[in-house]
Amino acid sequence: IEVILKLFSKAGLQKIFATLPDSQSSSENSHRIFALKNDYVKTIDQVILFLQGKNPTLARQICTMNFLPESSRFNQLDDMEFAFGNMGLQDKAKHLATLYLEDISDFIIENIDPDFGFSRYAERLGKSANSFDDLYAKLNENRTFIDEISLNILAQKLEFVQPKLVCFSVPFPGNLYAAF
């Protein structure tokens, strides 16, 4: 969660967008997100606070459809009033905020780290128990942007706690890469 919160923050998005030259993003969707980068940077901290339940009053602003920058995930919006009319403003806003985060996630996957996922980072590397060649190869590559965030957070925790022993639990294939 800490990695996601660091990544999906004003400072995190500024670093992401700063790593790419203006012309590097490839798809139309990525070009749109990059063009709206200032809007994403301006809104991300508020959206995360809303999704954490720390700013519920933002729901009305999110639902105006003028607050969040929109890219391809918003193309799948059908009749929002039909879908959320009875469920209320909070649920509609959570749905829109999730689409917003998924747009950013798509951008990260395409331009920063193809293995990124909210809960399944590099999952494909741990799915095949008969060979760890892909995992070994990935571990021998240069660290990714997200690797650096993860390792910095880990270093801070280790320095603060100064444990004698560190153990990692790997309950799902999507956790295997991060454990190494």
Report the location of each language-model feature:
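A short, structured N-terminal alpha-helical element that caps or precedes a catalytic domain
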Residues: 1-180
